[in-house]
From Swiss-Prot:
This is Probable glycerol-3-phosphate dehydrogenase, mitochondrial. It comes from Caenorhabditis elegans. SUPFAM superfamilies: EF-hand, FAD-linked reductases, C-terminal domain, FAD/NAD(P)-binding domain. SMART domains: EFh. Calcium-binding enhances the activity of the enzyme. It catalyses: a quinone + sn-glycerol 3-phosphate = dihydroxyacetone phosphate + a quinol. FAD binds at residues 76-104. One of its GO terms (molecular function) is calcium ion binding. Pathway: Polyol metabolism; glycerol degradation via glycerol kinase pathway; glycerone phosphate from sn-glycerol 3-phosphate (anaerobic route): step 1/1.
Length: 722
């Protein structure tokens, strides 16, 4: 049911229902809190204290881990899949005293786990469904998510933090409706509430979020959820498991599952995608934690499986410049044109928006489409002030992630599929964990290991100790740590903050790897890109964090591919060069890595979608319009080469006393360069103006700059463009 269809009468019914449900739960909630506190502070207190001691030694190398995996010794547990769920299972199993192995086809967090909305949801959307549909399962999911959110913020404070999210209200009847729902969320949160929600009036809302549309605005509700760096969080779980003794390797593919004479799975035959080496891994239990690829592994274990249990759904997000949102407040649009929700959030000094939700095929390389991107932009335009021009050219990156939703055969649309999980035991003994969401990865892992121990009769040293178990970088971290990096190493403040919030207490290890700048300030820290705080030393450290490809670095160790595809392209040569030094790559391998990374950025990070928006436009210019566009082209191509380079743009702007940042110059060229050859040809110029005239494009920065300089009407204005 759409949010806007509720009436004032419905509000009263909802509030009454919510009060009844929550009143009945009050006693159980308090009892549950006491049980959790008593259990994990007494039963496993000694074990947890031992495990939470910071390991001073370096991580084992990938070569050491592969040697351990290929020795032929039997593991208690072999996990297939290195996303959030697989990583959580590895950490849980290893800290119970089980000998644990994990293999991942690509990189840790290369799939869905790095392509989320970056929120640690307490489940506010599920609470609405629980109340409106009297759905007890959804309500339990909310309670589970609230506990897990609290735990995640505690065990990795350097990678996560509370984020206030604004819910703007444009109709008076929505005030009590949303207020009662958000207050119910606070109530269910109990002691785990991050901060109490509150209502602010129109002027306060605009002061907090100045770019918000002010027409008919009545006020806004502010509630709190968690936010994190998803790929780094995933990696922190993996690194913690490795430090406790687990053997976890990325870029290792399962070729087949090995079985005994009775058909029971007893391990897997694997292949190292880096070296090509193959071997068998023996295991008493094998766990399938492959997210959207769940069914392919299930079919290896039990070919007679009747039908799939996973229904993948594609969710697209986009990245916009940081000025699109305040640095400390997100926005929730609870009622988009298709009945879903859109989040608009500050993240890593940029702004991310999403998401879409549509059934999808399973693929290793999901790609955002221009249709998805335009849908998100259109929804954003509806909530932002008319003074804010939401431009297609401002989309710095876009990505698609496949949600591993559990299939319900009685429902066709993915909107109704809950993000809960199931644990299946196949006839072959293969354990499959499917579904779920980022926030509840730990609980899913706990239930999975419980089931594995039960089914396979494994002996553990202790029960689950992952609530309260600190992750890599959290042990000695505090929010003022970056000051020590500035004072002790002579780093720029934004660089020090980035290192502290990315590596936690391991930031000092990265700092010691930095080279001198040769300047008075900063003393150390060579930036890879002038607009971002990433350092060349981080590339070297990334190799120690098991980065094997340039994509591993730019997408997951550093998040530059998710933040700005142009900048990612620009730093790639330096990233490949440093990795080549660390890993001994030949010139041919470096060229191959560069090409693969460029393809990844273009295909999976939205660069091609932007080009498609222009390249699919048919030429529709009159003779006069083509002549006008040609004259504008020749103003830039003064030596009549037949194409425009970034040097031509630079010279033109300098001649007209326009100071344009070097990064922006490259972006202006890339937005029009359909052929991706570093040049703008006359045909591409005509294509651009045709798109502006036909309305397929809502604006172009290069055309806008040229109009400002020359003052003559362009096709953008004279030919009916939006």
């Amino acid at each position: 049911m759409s949010w806007v269809r509720f009436t004032k009468t419905g509000v009263a019914v909802v509030a009454t229902s919510a009060a009844a449900v929550l009143a009945l739960d009050m006693t159980n909630e308090r009892r549950f809190q006491r049980q959790v506190k008593d259990h994990f502070r007494t039963v496993h207190a000694d074990r947890l204290a031992e495990l939470n001691k910071r390991a001073p030694s370096a991580l084992p190398t990938r070569k050491d881990i592969l040697t351990n995996l290929s020795k032929g010794e039997e593991f208690d547990v072999l996990i297939i899949g290195g996303g959030a769920t697989g990583a959580g299972v590895a950490l849980d199993a290893q800290t119970r005293g089980l000998k644990t192995a994990l293999v991942e086809l690509d990189d840790f967090s290369s799939g869905t786990s790095s392509r989320s909305t970056k929120l640690i949801h307490g489940g506010v959307r599920y609470l609405q469904a629980a109340i409106m549909k009297l759905d007890l399962e959804q309500y339990r999911m909310v309670k589970e998510a609230l506990f897990e959110r609290h735990n995640l913020l505690e065990i990795a404070p350097h990678l996560s933090s509370p984020l206030p999210i604004m819910l703007p209200i444009y109709k008076l009847w929505q005030v009590p409706y949303y207020w009662s729902g958000i207050k119910a969320y606070d109530f269910v949160s109990g002691k785990r509430v991050l901060k109490n929600s509150f209502f602010i009036n129109k002027s306060q809302a605009l002061e907090r979020f100045p770019m918000l549309r002010n027409e008919s605005l009545k006020g806004a509700l502010i509630y709190y959820d968690g936010q994190h760096n998803d790929a780094r969080m995933n990696l922190a779980i993996i690194l913690t498991a490795i430090r406790h003794g687990a053997a976890c390797a990325n870029h290792v593919r399962v070729e087949k599952l090995n079985k005994d004479e009775t058909g029971k799975v007893i391990g897997a035959h694997v292949r190292d995608m880096v070296t090509g080496g193959e071997w068998d891994i023996k295991a008493k239990a094998v766990i399938n934690a492959t997210g959207p690829f769940t069914d392919s592994i299930r079919l290896m274990g039990d070919p007679e499986t009747a039908r799939p249990i996973c229904a993948p759904s594609s969710g697209v997000h986009i990245t916009l410049p940081g000025y699109y949102s305040p640095s400390n407040t997100g926005l929730l649009d609870p009622d988009t044109s298709d009945g879903r929700v859109i989040f608009f959030l500050p993240w890593e000094r940029m702004t991310i928006a999403g998401t879409t939700d549509a059934p999808s095929d399973v693929t290793l390389s999901p790609q955002p489409t221009d249709h998805d991107i335009e849908f998100i932009l259109q929804e954003i335009r509806g909530y932002l002030s008319k003074d804010v021009s939401v431009r297609r050219g401002d989309v710095m990156s876009a990505w698609s992630g496949l949600r591993p939703l559990v299939r319900d055969p009685n429902k066709k649309d993915t909107k109704s599929l809950a993000r809960n999980h199931i644990i299946e035991v196949g006839k072959s003994g293969l354990i499959t964990i499917a579904g779920g969401k980022w926030t509840t990865y730990r609980h899913m892992a706990e239930e999975t290991v419980d089931r594995v121990v039960e089914v396979h009769g494994l002996k553990t040293e202790n029960g689950c100790v992952t609530p309260g178990l600190l992750l890599e970088g959290a042990h000695d971290w505090n929010s003022l740590q970056y000051i020590h990096l500035v004072q002790d190493y002579g780093m720029e403040v934004d660089v020090a903050q980035h290192l502290s919030n990315t590596y936690g207490d391991r930031a000092f290890v990265v700092a010691r790897m930095c080279k001198m700048t040769g300047k008075r300030w900063p003393i150390v820290g060579q930036r890879l890109h002038p607009e971002f705080p990433y350092l060349d030393a981080e590339v070297r450290y990334a190799v120690r964090e098991y980065a094997c490809t340039a994509i591993d670095v730019i997408a997951r160790r550093m998040r530059l591919a998710f933040l700005n595809t142009y900048a990612a392209h620009e730093v790639l040569p330096d990233v490949v060069r440093v990795m080549g030094q660390e890993l001994g790559w030949s010139s041919a391998e470096q060229r191959a890595q560069l090409e693969k990374a460029r393809t990844f950025i273009d295909m999976e990070m939205g660069q091609n979608a932007k080009q498609t928006a222009v390249s699919n436009v048919a030429l529709n210019l009159t003779k006069e319009e083509m002549q006008r566009a040609k004259e504008r082209f020749q103003q830039l191509d003064k030596d009549r080469k037949g194409h425009i380079t970034v040097n031509d743009l630079r010279k033109h702007f300098r001649e007209h006393n326009q100071k344009i940042d070097e990064r922006v110059l490259h972006e202006l060229l890339n937005e029009v360069d359909l052929n991706k050859n570093g040049e703008i040809e006359i045909a591409e110029f005509f294509q651009l103006y045709s798109g502006l005239k036909g309305g397929q494009l809502t604006g172009n920065r290069l055309v806008g700059y040229l109009d400002e300089i020359h003052g003559t009407p362009s096709v953008n204005r004279a030919c009916g463009g939006i």
